[in-house]
Curated annotation (Swiss-Prot):
A GO cellular component annotation in the UniProt record: nucleus
Primary location: nucleus
Domain of life according to the entry: Eukaryota
Organism: Danio rerio
Alphabetically ordered keywords of this record: Centromere, Chromosome, Coiled coil, Nucleus
A Pfam cross-reference name: CENP-P
GO biological process: CENP-A containing chromatin assembly
Gene: cenpp
Keyword hit for Zinc: no
Its job: Probable component of a centromeric complex involved in assembly of kinetochore proteins, mitotic progression and chromosome segregation.
Regions annotated as coiled coil: 1-80
Compartment list: Nucleus; Chromosome, Centromere
Entry protein name: Centromere protein P
Similarity field: Belongs to the CENP-P/CTF19 family.
């Protein structure tokens, strides 16, 4: 009977520790999401109550801690380009040797919105701490996701969370490069450049106002390898009426894509697109 009581007491102690850990994690999450409002609320309460020296010191210390948390978050955002809007942590199991936590992170990297849910298991063996991700689910929202979906699926299978965040920033930067380039040429040549799916898509159509039926379609995909290597892939499709094709004795239309690839290597992306547009306008 005594042994049973000891076991019950031990279980209660473990539950208390888990609840305390959850409380601490909840407060940390609240600071992440509502730091500004908390800081203002604490200031208002202090001003209304007047408070003694000890109370004011405690409030001042709390405000300082909130500010430090905010500075750390801003610093991390500047370093990795990722902004977190939500951070939730829940302890599922806690003992002397093992800790299991469920986490949910939501935010954005550039124009890409993401939500990541994962479980982390920590096991203490002698003086060595083993930590691994045991579950992983990733949701990325944006028109660019079709270029990213295969990579995300593989990351979910391998549970390589660090690879996902490293690749997310590079992928987001390449998407932004494409968006800015497309938008630039559409604004510069509104009568020639058409973006049927918007400036965040992978397609640009170049049409000549003087030569109906002749067009160039630029495909700008962003490929992500299974190792997380991000590489832009550009291709060109030329189109003209059948009658004009019969006069194309030099096979310009047939070899147009190869010519464009050579142009990319020599001049780069923006100068190559500029050359295509000027050729159509001339």
């Amino acid at each position: 009977m005594e042994q049973k009581y000891e076991e019950d007491i031990q279980k209660l102690q473990q539950e208390i520790e888990m609840l305390e850990a959850e409380q601490e994690e909840t407060l940390r999450s609240i600071f992440v999401q509502h730091g500004d409002r908390l800081q203002q609320g604490v200031k208002s309460a202090c001003e209304e109550r007047g408070g003694g020296g000890a109370q004011q010191h405690a409030v001042s210390k709390l405000i300082t801690e909130v500010r430090e948390l905010e500075k750390d978050l801003r610093r991390q955002t500047e370093i990795n380009g990722i902004t977190l809007n939500e951070c939730f942590v829940k302890t599922l199991h806690k003992s002397e040797r093992k800790l299991v936590q469920q986490l949910r992170l939501a935010g954005h990297c550039g124009l890409l919105l993401f939500q990541v849910e994962f479980a982390v298991t920590e096991i203490q063996e002698d003086n060595v701490l083993h930590r691994r991700v045991t579950e992983l689910n990733i949701v990325v929202d944006g028109v660019e996701f079709k270029d990213f979906s295969a990579f995300v699926s593989r990351v979910e299978d391998t549970k390589d969370l660090l690879l996902f965040f490293r690749t997310l920033r590079t992928f987001s930067e390449r998407c932004e490069d494409r968006r800015q380039t497309f938008q630039h040429f559409q604004e510069k040549y509104p009568d020639v450049v058409n973006l049927p799916e918007g400036c965040r898509s992978e397609i640009m159509i170049i049409r000549s106002p003087q030569l109906p039926g002749i067009s160039m379609t630029l495909f700008w995909k962003i490929h992500v390898s299974k190792e997380g290597v991000v590489k832009p892939l550009l291709d060109l499709l030329l189109k003209m009426p059948d009658q004009a094709l019969e006069l194309d004795t030099k096979k310009v239309m047939e070899k147009g894509s190869d010519y464009f690839q050579s142009l990319l290597q020599l001049l780069g992306v923006e100068a190559s697109i500029e050359g295509l547009i000027r050729a159509v306008c001339s």
